[in-house]
């Protein structure tokens, strides 16, 4: 069995020409968490398995990802490194991988043009292509394809949202996960907008459903607040990796502390 991965996420925005890491609740009310290069270095030293670097203002504002920051971060970091945000073309992917990233994460562009996933996977290899799926619970069951039972017994389906969670697109997240796997995605980064930034725990019902429906790794994202949440994400949610931002940025829990806790509870991690 492959070791489960712990992945800090750096949500980066441009502040008067300086890149800063920010974190908000459900993608709004963003607060400053520091310099991305310094944080990336710290996480590498603390035992993170990988990093995800999301330029969260790139898609909505149509701005290209901050290549200089990627280059500086890549120089300091020796673990695999994924970059997303505003990636719309093969040229964008080439630029980012050339700047030092190991993988790219595609979200909005994949929804608008699914063939982009296939083309990217054909050129760069599936191992470089992560499709990020942001989704939100929808209780109008007539519109969903895969109905998921929630923790309290109510039922919902999960609708894909794009542009940083701002625009619902009427696509079922489970159906979309299966589709991007067919198109050649090597991994899925799944964020439940219902949990993002809440620290209430990962959204187990949708994480488990998608993990069961696809054969590629699923990264659970949105809601991590305690060590137990990581255990739940791996064991109940069947995720291959768990991603978090604010609890790491503000030093609420250390990466090593989480890994030691998981190992004690029988989850295989890289210590």
From Swiss-Prot:
Protein name: Imidazole glycerol phosphate synthase subunit HisF
Pfam families linked: His_biosynth (PF00977)
UniProt xrefs under SUPFAM superfamilies: Ribulose-phoshate binding barrel
One Gene Ontology CC term in the entry: cytoplasm
Family: Belongs to the HisA/HisF family.
Primary role: IGPS catalyzes the conversion of PRFAR and glutamine to IGP, AICAR and glutamate. The HisF subunit catalyzes the cyclization activity that produces IGP and AICAR from PRFAR using the ammonia provided by the HisH subunit.
Quaternary structure (record): Heterodimer of HisH and HisF.
Catalysis: reaction(s): 5-[(5-phospho-1-deoxy-D-ribulos-1-ylimino)methylamino]-1-(5-phospho-beta-D-ribosyl)imidazole-4-carboxamide + L-glutamine = D-erythro-1-(imidazol-4-yl)glycerol 3-phosphate + 5-amino-1-(5-phospho-beta-D-ribosyl)imidazole-4-carboxamide + L-glutamate + H(+)
InterPro entries documented for this protein: Aldolase_TIM (IPR013785), His_biosynth (IPR006062), HisF (IPR004651), IGPS_HisA/HisF (IPR050064), RibuloseP-bd_barrel (IPR011060)
